[in-house]
A protein has these predicted regions:
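Bacterial N-terminal signal peptides that target proteins for export
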Residues: 2-10
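Extended active-site neighborhood of metal-dependent phosphoesterases/phosphodiesterases
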Residues: 92-204, 214-218
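Well-ordered alpha-helical segments embedded in enzymatic catalytic cores
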Residues: 63-67, 110, 205
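Active-site neighborhood of phospho(di)ester-bond hydrolases with catalytic His/Asp-centered motifs
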Residues: 44-46, 78-85, 123-129, 194, ...
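Bacterial N-terminal signal peptides
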Residues: 10-20
Length: 220
């Protein structure tokens, strides 16, 4: 065997051995499970905005909600929450391909589609962040939130809504809403979503909700 061919042969052998060793050292996948059968889970998702602004990243967020959907029973998932900034730009028409390559309508449609995997399976409570308003970073109060996440989008979420405050356009939406959630053990929780930098009227509305006698024993 010629020297050049011999070097190539040894290189292939070494590569195969390294790959075999790496595979052998990989831990066997263990499916998620609860250590206590009486336990239950709440899933908290951070800002999805960066996943929505580029088309190539959108499947990554769908993978997250798909994982949640597949593990609802295994992890006894009772509720999904999100911190807001569902999109990067609320009203961008022509992306420049650098800051984003998806127009706002495409971003909203993408995040709504991802959460749609959970519709009818588990309730989700989504806050509205500063990027979800105006053209860029709450330049105005208008948001497309209610267009893509109306109250009746997910009947599981609709069942736990107790009150809906008015958005800047005077429409009751889940941008400002009160949710009553009861754990499998019967513990009651009061959850509120408030618009980013809430107006004085919304702060007053939230105080009125939390001061109601029927919520005095709720965890919030």
């Amino acid at each position: 065997m010629k020297r050049g061919n011999l070097k190539f042969f040894y290189s292939i052998v070494v590569a195969i051995l390294c790959l075999t060793n790496a595979v052998a050292q990989q831990q066997k996948y263990t499916a998620p499970s609860l250590s206590d059968s009486n336990s239950w889970s709440i899933i908290m998702l951070p800002d999805p905005q960066t996943y929505q602004k580029f088309e190539r990243n959108q499947p990554l967020f769908e993978l997250m909600t798909a994982w949640i959907s597949e593990n609802i029973e295994k992890l006894n998932i009772q509720l999904v929450m999100c911190t807001g900034d569902l999109v990067e730009q609320n009203e961008m028409i022509n992306p420049n391909g650098i800051a984003a390559n998806q127009a706002s309508k495409q971003q909203w449609a993408s995040v709504a589609r991802a959460f749609g995997r959970l519709d009818g399976k588990v309730p989700y409570v989504l806050a509205a962040g500063n990027h979800d308003y105006g053209y860029s970073n709450i330049s105005v109060r208008r948001s497309n939130y209610n267009t893509y996440f109306p109250v009746d989008k997910n009947f599981k979420t609709q069942k736990i809504i107790r009150e809906a405050g008015l958005n800047a356009e005077g429409v009751p939406t889940m941008e400002n809403a009160a949710f009553e959630f009861t754990s499998p053990q019967g513990r009651k929780f009061l959850l509120l979503t408030l618009e980013f930098a809430p107006r004085d009227t919304i702060v007053a509305w939230a105080k009125n909700v939390t001061n109601q006698a029927r919520y005095k024993d709720h965890t919030g």
